[in-house]
Amino acid sequence: MGGTRKHGILSDTHLKTLIRDRAIDADPAVTDGQVQPASVDLRLGTKAYRLISSFLPERSEISERLNVLDLYQSELVMYEIDLTQGAILEKGHVYLVPLLERVTLPPDVRGKANPKSSTGRLDIFTRLITDLNAGFDEIPAGYQGPLYLEIVPRSFTIRVQTGLALNQLRLLTGRPAVSDSRLRVLHRSAKLLYHNDDDPADSRPLAAPDVRVDHGLFLRIDLRGSGTDREIVGYRAKKNSHVVDLSRTGHYSALDFWEPIYRQSNNTLLLEPEEFYILASHERIKVPAGYAAEMVAYEAAFGELRTHYAGFFDPGFGAGDGPRKGTQVVLEVRPHDVPFLIHDGQTFFKVVYEHMLDLPERLYGASIGSSYHQQGLTLSKHFKW
């Protein structure tokens, strides 16, 4: 893979070249609207399979596994669903959807996938699967073949249709991770983290000694907001049997589906097992043009507390044109096993920065249709107030 660097995330320029050369191919063809600054959206195909369980096809093609019988001679596939006119995927059930896109990757290019922001904020668990692969959300270098998406709606029953994009694919070559020493230099020169409690017309970056770096930037949780009484600092998903049609924007009343969480006097929050929460970061983050980033869970401290679904940040995230720099990170949180008490300012997750192979043609923001470019604590685009 040629370029100005030997290691990096492929930009929209490279992605369009791969699409033109049919290394990323689909029927109907991949559109320009699917191409983001550092990723490409992947679309649902024409049918879904309702499965009895999740699986990984480590030593076989996925199409072969769909005919395997379990201990009681039941097929992995319970039934098929036609998605061409839209269909319902029920919460708590496992589905597998062949995607419209397939890839023929160069030998030095591999891929990784993540849910789109709206997918994560709806508590829809998705994972990319490929043939002969022992891992989720990863495509090995040189892979040639179809792509499949495992879908498990957790909080809400959803309606989907052929052509809808629930996840995105990022392609990379070499070792693009930014070292800790480079991250510190980058924060001093480009300012990666900003305080969130300042004047909205101003931006104050974190002092260098306050930036915690260890294979990425550590960020904290915000349970205080501006400190006023009755301020909303999060949301918890309600038990709701209504169907959320993912093709509708600004359609559903937020209070029918979400319970606001108000700031407590001691700035803490008790997370209950198997409840789903939307929270926000204490800091505002920026991703400079020559970099991309990915949010990862702070696993060492939280174990089974899942702190995100959607994790990609495109070049230009949080940059903006106004005086207020940086953007809060919205977190999707689902505790497991036991109640978990968190407090304002607690270290909660980590963002890993990676080099771009070259600068993208376009940066993240409203000009490319980004729904959350000026987000604070924000629900998915399907809800209204």
Question: In which residue ranges do the predicted regions lie?
Answer:
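DUTPase catalytic domain/fold
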Residues: 1-385
